[in-house]
A protein has these predicted regions:
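Basic, low-complexity intrinsically disordered segments
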Residues: 1-376
């Protein structure tokens, strides 16, 4: 009879965890490779379709007939997944992303380039884009008409690892336009190339903050407590709306100063800036008293809560009607307090897009004037 082998529980558990980790990583690599292969394949299928159509008639009826016939043949040979609407999307995908090749996300470019090494190209002279997202993400992105906005969403989606649902929401709520409206005009063009970088405290605040996902009805009167409860209940979405790096710490945080009790509505910590972020919710117009109270909260946290290595505390006042003049007159120019108007419904997309277009045209005109002055 063979000798029984007794294994150490800790050793076998270590082995088990190593195997699980290895298999998990392998599956992730396979999933990434499949995504890259699918997107690149559809990009080149779109290229084949467009090139075929260019050799024939240019009428819309001709293109529709081509896609319907191709759909029938591909379905017969390859099975489901090649409907007329799918081929129409593939064709549009190539048309959109072959213009300027807006993709350029750093995280997956190396993997994509490795995969591309042996990939058959329809035309050798065609430069290759770098696709870092799934096909589902690109179905959303290619419907964004503004190339700068599309590039911005693609970069942000890759860096922040947004799900399809999160990307759809950010596009639908005009994140690009809202960020553009909240920043200096000269920074509008930078958004499309770099995404939203965090260099100073004001960069973590998106203005105005859209709260329509809270499900609050129009023209209703809300107490601060009800609004706060709604925000707490959907904290994950709210953090996404606020910006990058927010970690929730507490609500109605109490502290005592000069034998008086004070309560901070919401306390966050921003891991990217390494600082506390205090939020106060106001339903009525912003007053001098509100600003003074927030300044006191900020001073308390800076003196008694934050560590030496951490940056100064940020205070944010959320109010229905922002009065920038009041903020400027009441606070020092470099104060870390900002008033962000929040709105219960999606912004008027047409108006926001018109504003951004106006700013872009103004920016281009100014750049042209600068070039002319340099040559004079």
């Amino acid at each position: 009879m063979g000798k029984e082998i007794i294994t150490n529980d800790k050793d076998i558990n270590d082995l088990f965890l190593k195997v699980v980790d290895l298999v998990t990583q392998a599956r992730e690599r396979v999933a990434t490779a499949i995504n890259i292969a699918e997107v690149f394949t559809k990009f080149h299928i779109g290229q084949y379709i467009v090139e075929y159509e260019q050799k024939g008639e240019t009428r819309a009826e001709y293109g529709k007939a081509v896609l319907k016939e191709l759909s029938k043949r591909l379905t017969d040979r390859l099975g489901d997944g090649w409907s007329y609407s799918t081929l129409k999307n593939i064709r549009q995908f190539y048309i959109v992303f072959s213009k300027g090749l807006t993709s350029g996300c750093p995280k997956s470019s190396q993997k994509a380039n490795q995969w591309l090494a042996d990939y058959p190209k329809a035309e050798e002279h065609i430069s290759e884009p770098t696709f870092a997202l799934s096909w589902s993400h690109y179905l959303i992105l290619m419907r964004v008409e503004n190339p700068d906005a599309r590039s911005f969403y693609e970069i942000e989606c890759t860096q922040q690892q947004w799900s399809k649902r999160q990307l759809s929401r950010q596009v639908g709520s005009c994140l690009y336009e809202r960020l553009a409206l909240s920043r200096n005009k000269d920074e509008v063009m930078r958004l499309a190339k770099e995404g939203q970088s965090i260099e100073k405290p004001s960069d973590i605040i998106k203005n105005p903050i859209t709260l329509e996902f809270l499900g609050l009805k129009p023209d209703a009167v809300y107490s601060e407590s009800k609004l706060e409860n709604a925000i707490i209940n959907k904290m994950q979405q709210f953090l996404l709306e606020l910006g990058k790096g927010f970690l929730f710490e507490a609500r109605q945080k109490r502290f005592t100063f000069d034998e008086q009790h004070f309560f901070v509505d919401l306390v966050f910590y921003n891991r990217l800036l390494q600082c506390y972020v205090l939020i106060d919710l106001k339903i009525d117009k912003l007053t001098h008293q509100d600003l003074g109270q927030m300044q006191m909260y900020v001073n308390y946290y800076d003196r008694y809560v934050k560590q030496d290595f951490e940056k100064p505390t940020i205070g944010i006042l959320l109010c229905k009607e922002k009065n920038d003049a009041l903020v400027e007159l009441t606070l020092p120019k470099d104060a870390n307090i900002y008033a962000s108007a929040y709105q219960l419904y999606l912004p008027n997309k047409a108006l926001l897009q018109a504003k951004v277009k106006e700013w872009i045209e103004e920016f281009e005109e100014n750049e042209e004037l600068k070039r002319l002055e340099e040559h004079e």
